[in-house]
């Protein structure tokens, strides 16, 4: 199985459903014998540029380990979910478990 880093932006009006969305994606990954190594909720942040006339979005970061089929299903779910404005998936060489720079910045 390969390691991936996923960042997705959720519509600010759907912020209440973020935890349910994340749990659904986590269950989908774990059902396929995958693992979630890191999950960070960065909260509502200002976008660098407007997306669909919105200036804020709810950011989520996940570092996961899964097979290609599960990743394809996740990406399909991201595309067909109207609440997700953007998503980015990057393949990593190894699992990343330490806190990201965004979370370290929040703690200070």
UniProtKB/Swiss-Prot annotation:
Molecular function via GO: small ribosomal subunit rRNA binding; structural constituent of ribosome
Database matches in Pfam families: Ribosomal_S6
GO CC, alphabetical: cytosolic small ribosomal subunit
Gene3D superfamilies: 3.30.70.60
Keywords recorded for this protein, A-Z: Ribonucleoprotein, Ribosomal protein, RNA-binding, rRNA-binding
Superkingdom in the source lineage: Bacteria
SUPFAM superfamilies from the UniProt entry: Ribosomal protein S6
GO biological process, one term: translation
Keyword Thylakoid: no
Sequence similarity: Belongs to the bacterial ribosomal protein bS6 family.
Protein role: Binds together with bS18 to 16S ribosomal RNA.
Annotated protein name in UniProt: Small ribosomal subunit protein bS6
Originating species: Dichelobacter nodosus (strain VCS1703A)
Gene that this sequence comes from: rpsF
């Amino acid at each position: 199985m390969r390691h991936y880093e996923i960042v997705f932006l959720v519509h600010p009006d759907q912020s209440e459903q973020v935890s349910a969305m994340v749990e659904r994606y986590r269950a989908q990954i774990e059902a396929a014998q995958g693992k979630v190594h890191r999950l960070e909720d960065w909260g509502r942040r200002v976008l660098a540029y407007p997306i669909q006339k919105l200036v804020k979005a709810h950011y989520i970061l996940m570092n996961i380990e899964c097979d290609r089929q599960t990743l394809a299903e996740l990406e399909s779910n991201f595309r067909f979910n109207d609440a997700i404005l953007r998503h980015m998936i990057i393949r990593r060489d190894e699992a990343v478990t330490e806190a990201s720079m965004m979370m370290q910045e929040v703690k200070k």
